[in-house]
């Protein structure tokens, strides 16, 4: 779905047999990521969105954590959110410089950001993978599914930069019908994932999802959009 001639730039300036380009019809970010993980030759897959940046030592540092924590199926790191007017360090309180295992469900959205995610392929393949046609929260839904079946490692050092407010970003308008539908899918599939773990589900994830549901309902009320509320109900 890229419109910035990224493939042409890569082909012109980089000649490395480790770089492989796969062409497919634009079916959304979830299908593209699933294809990328499927084609990956290694056991660990580091994700990077086109608008974002890694610190020069990101892969080196994350590789060290992988080597020291082989039982983990997901590796995350803190990030900097850069908007048009300011930058914000996104690190959960008390986790600055922390390096170790975490309970992801204490704060999924602040712990997890796509370009600071390294997946263990064998664990990824045991989940439902990224859900096609979701344009919002598909990344949170995936890392939740992984965290339900494998330990999660977190590095509280901001090693990647998330760029928001970029023209043409799929997530620029959170109030479209497709975006609203994606958020409902996030909640419903998230609860299904939780209940697969046990009869009552994962308690921490259940609490987080109820918190998400409450605030999403308040947001829809504030919009005074009856259609959005009906979709929610």
Which residues does each PLM region occupy?
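Acidic metal-phosphate-binding loop of nucleotide-sugar-dependent transferases
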Residues: 52-53, 134
């Amino acid at each position: 779905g890229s419109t910035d001639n990224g493939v042409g730039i890569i082909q012109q300036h980089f000649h490395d047999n480790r770089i492989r380009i796969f062409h497919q019809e634009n079916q959304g970010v979830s299908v593209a990521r699933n294809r990328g993980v499927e084609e990956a030759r290694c056991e660990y897959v580091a994700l990077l969105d086109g608008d974002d940046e890694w610190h020069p030592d990101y892969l080196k540092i994350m590789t060290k954590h992988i080597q020291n924590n082989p039982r983990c199926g997901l590796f995350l790191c803190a990030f900097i959110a850069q908007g048009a007017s300011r930058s914000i360090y996104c690190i959960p309180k008390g986790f600055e410089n922390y390096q170790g295992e975490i309970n992801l469900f204490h704060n999924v959205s602040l712990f997890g950001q796509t370009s600071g995610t390294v997946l263990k392929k064998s664990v990824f393949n045991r989940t439902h993978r990224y859900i096609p046609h979701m344009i919002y929260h598909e990344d949170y839904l995936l890392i939740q599914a992984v965290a339900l079946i494998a330990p999660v490692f977190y590095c509280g050092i901001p090693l990647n930069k998330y760029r928001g407010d970029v023209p043409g970003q799929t997530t620029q308008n959170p109030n479209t019908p497709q975006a609203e539908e994606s958020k409902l899918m996030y909640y419903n599939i998230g609860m299904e994932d939780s209940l697969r773990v046990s009869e009552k589900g994962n308690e921490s994830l259940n609490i987080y999802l109820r918190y998400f549901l409450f605030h999403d309902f308040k947001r829809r009320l504030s919009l005074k959009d009856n259609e959005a509320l009906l979709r929610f109900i």
